[in-house]
């Protein structure tokens, strides 16, 4: 599925834009602050319901406006789908699909699987475990129909359990929450373990192409001891959890650890090497989705040239072309992306929120 049309209104510094897009490569070229990243962010927001540079809705809506409006047309092999998202300063969203309201943001996310590569994306590698959980959960969401509901219920139950820990004095008082929490936790952990085991070979192969000088290993940590029932862990750690006033073990504490030559990648790799690794992981995940489901990702790449030499840019470009996916790339200069361009590509110039092709 590719995004053939994008309408943007009052998003960041873009007052209004109507873009006809290529199903292949789309380049956004302009100076820093011109609005090229805002176009990428509009696409991301249309598929996620939130921006990637700020969680504060007031910073995303154009100055002195009440709401932003995003519309898109998705072209699949058999049909076209119209999608829309409106969000106001109070954070209230309206999702429209094929002319009908009342839809959920998760439906947009399912329609538009996308991979985001930005200069801020290093958190996948040097940030906390929550970023690597999100990496796994993206794959589980697109691979398991029941994942999103289970994950949402897990978040709710952990929050309720943490609140209850401040009020109870005996474990028996907490058991009603745990009876609901335990099967959800075990199911989500199984899905994550199965997904990580299935994709690890693809990741290793892709990472070897981008970083042949390192041996990379991947390990999923589910958030509590191996070979131990989650029910036993919760009961055994009740007093400690009550003292901490939060649940210290569970899938909400899981991690996906990545090592280079046996050491954490954040301690071993340079910033340029970390960007290569991030690109390799996102690419491998998108390719895996295509291989197992036949669905293709959209790739959003901000500041393409930064910290990549010509050879690495060429490698990333060739791998992206091989996916036959739709790709959006921002760059300061057209020279940085000319080698990626072909007869099916589109080049957009961005200046002070105005976009021309």
UniProtKB/Swiss-Prot annotation:
Which annotated residues bind ATP?
A: 30-37
Q: Gene Ontology cellular component?
A: cytoplasm
Where is it localised? Answer: Cytoplasm
**Per UniProt, what is the name of the gene that codes for the protein in this document?**
recF
| Entries under InterPro entries matching the protein | DNA-binding_RecF, DNA-binding_RecF_CS, P-loop_NTPase, RecF/RecN/SMC_N, RecF_2
Q: Could you tell me the Gene Ontology terms of the biological process aspect for this record?
A: DNA replication; DNA synthesis involved in DNA repair; double-strand break repair; SOS response
Q: Which UniProt keywords are listed? A: ATP-binding, Cytoplasm, DNA damage, DNA repair, DNA replication, DNA-binding, Nucleotide-binding, SOS response
Which family does the entry's similarity section mention? Belongs to the RecF family.
What is this protein's name? DNA replication and repair protein RecF
Report the domain of life of the source organism.
Bacteria
Outline what the protein does: The RecF protein is involved in DNA metabolism; it is required for DNA replication and normal SOS inducibility. RecF binds preferentially to single-stranded, linear DNA. It also seems to bind ATP.
Task: Supply one GO molecular-function term.
Answer: single-stranded DNA binding
């Amino acid at each position: 599925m590719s995004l053939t049309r994008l309408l943007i209104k009052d998003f960041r510094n873009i007052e209004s834009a109507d873009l006809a897009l290529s199903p292949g490569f789309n380049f956004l070229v302009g100076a820093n602050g011109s609005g090229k990243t805002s176009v990428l962010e509009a696409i991301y927001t249309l598929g996620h319901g939130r921006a990637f540079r700020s969680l504060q809705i007031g910073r995303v809506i154009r100055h002195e406006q009440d709401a932003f409006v995003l519309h898109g047309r998705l072209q699949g092999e058999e049909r076209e789908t119209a999608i829309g998202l409106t969000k106001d300063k109070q954070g209230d969203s309206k999702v429209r699909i094929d002319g009908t309201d009342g839809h959920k943001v998760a439906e947009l996310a399912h329609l538009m699987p996308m991979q985001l590569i930005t200069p801020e994306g290093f958190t996948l590698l040097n940030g906390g475990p929550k970023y690597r959980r999100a990496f796994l959960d993206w794959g589980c969401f697109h691979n398991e129909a029941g994942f999103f509901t289970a994950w949402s219920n897990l978040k709710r139950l952990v929050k309720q359990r943490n609140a209850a820990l401040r009020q109870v004095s005996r474990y028996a008082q907490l058991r009603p929450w745990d009876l609901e929490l335990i099967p959800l936790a075990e199911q989500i952990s199984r899905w994550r373990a199965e997904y990580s085991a299935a994709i690890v070979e693809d990741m290793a192969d892709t990472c070897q192409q981008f970083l042949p000088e390192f041996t990379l290993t991947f390990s999923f940590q589910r958030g509590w001891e191996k070979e131990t029932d989650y029910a036993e862990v919760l009961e055994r750690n009740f007093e400690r959890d009550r003292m901490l006033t939060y649940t210290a073990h569970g899938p909400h504490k899981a991690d996906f650890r990545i090592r280079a030559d046996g050491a954490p990648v954040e301690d071993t790799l340079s910033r340029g090497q970390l960007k290569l690794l991030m690109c390799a992981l996102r690419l491998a995940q998108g390719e895996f989705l295509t291989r197992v489901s036949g669905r293709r990702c959209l790739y959003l790449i901000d500041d393409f040239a930064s910290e990549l030499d010509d050879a690495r840019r060429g490698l990333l470009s060739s791998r992206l072309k091989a996916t036959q996916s739709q790709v959006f790339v921002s760059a300061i200069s057209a020279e940085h992306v000319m080698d990626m361009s072909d007869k099916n590509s589109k080049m957009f110039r961005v200046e002070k929120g105005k976009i021309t092709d």
